[in-house]
Amino acid sequence: MRLNDSPQVEHVIAQDIDANRSLDWDNVILACGPCNRTKSNRQCPPTTHYLPEYHNTHLAFDYFVSSQKNHGEPAAYIRPHQQYIDIVKANNTIDLCALDRDTTRTFDQATDLRWKYRFETMVRALILRDELEEWPYINLHGFIKFLKMIVEATGFWSIWYETFIDVLEIRRMLVMDFAGTDQHSFDSTTFLPIPRTPRHAGDSI
């Protein structure tokens, strides 16, 4: 999977808060540079934030899939009508890494290019979605193999999943063929997202 920024080691509990935990395996995660810089030394335990190591974050967050450069549209927002989402925890997560940051107004000077990369991927995803719709007799198996190569080259798994969410065979490919995708976060038959921690009432994702 393509990485647009050099991965950095991020500490859930910052080193200047508890240096003794700086090498603890359960205290480190991979993060992109802009996310890491934005987080700084703020703590983000799974009790107050949604983390992909513990939660099915695809259920908590969404962003507009659009080919139009409208201000803010590619930014993350909390999925509506999800009664099991902890709104405070979701907002904490968005704020932690500035997932809703809109860099369109300062594009020429921006150093945080997450918006640019997301937008470019959205355009590609929508083009390929149109291709699938316009070719009713397309070889779906061949299309899926081609699509997998594109997803591997561009990244942004969630954009591709959301764009093709109504195509079962593509959902299956995205869930089953990408290493690191948590199998417990998706139904084993429909490959639709499901709560990852259903035992936790009020915060099951």
Model-derived features: where do they sit?
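Charged, amphipathic alpha-helical linkers/stalks
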Residues: 73-103
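Histidine-centered nuclease catalytic patch
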Residues: 1-30, 42-59
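Detector for the c-type heme attachment site
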Residues: 36-37
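C-terminal, charged low-complexity interaction regions
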Residues: 91-205
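Histidine (H) residue identity feature
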Residues: 11, 49, 55-58, 71, ...
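Short Fe-S-cluster ligation motifs
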Residues: 21-33, 58-82
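Intrinsic-disorder/low-complexity coil detector
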Residues: 44-45, 51, 73, 135, ...
